[in-house]
Amino acid sequence: TVVNEMIAAKTTHRIGGVIRSGQTIDLMGDVLFLGDLHSGATLCASGNIFVMGQVGGVVQAGSQGDARAVVVGDLKGAGQIRIADVVEIVADHYDPDRPVAYLNELHTMTHAGLADLASIRPRLFKQMEAM
């Protein structure tokens, strides 16, 4: 039902462990992932993704078209970062001081520091403060 979909979209899932090559985790809502995402694995969420661990596979936020979604974490080993319909191949020049991936007003993948999250996505930052 529509109500169940709305509730699921506002849920924050907390998952941990290892997502192995060939596995795909696809969730509605935001995801806090504590673990390792191996090369060839995919972590997909309709909302934001926050990763605390090693990333070697594909991280996809905003999978239902939410261009306001962000991906936060150490993404230097990620194969791809996807937000909505935009895909970025993580290059060798990844900057660990800019762990926030988001789409800017030109619908281009951009990276920023954690301190910038409040100005980039103020609503998200206020939701995090309320937790």
Regions found by a protein language model. Name each.
Residues T1-G40, C44, Q54-M131:
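Charge-rich, low-hydrophobicity low-complexity segments
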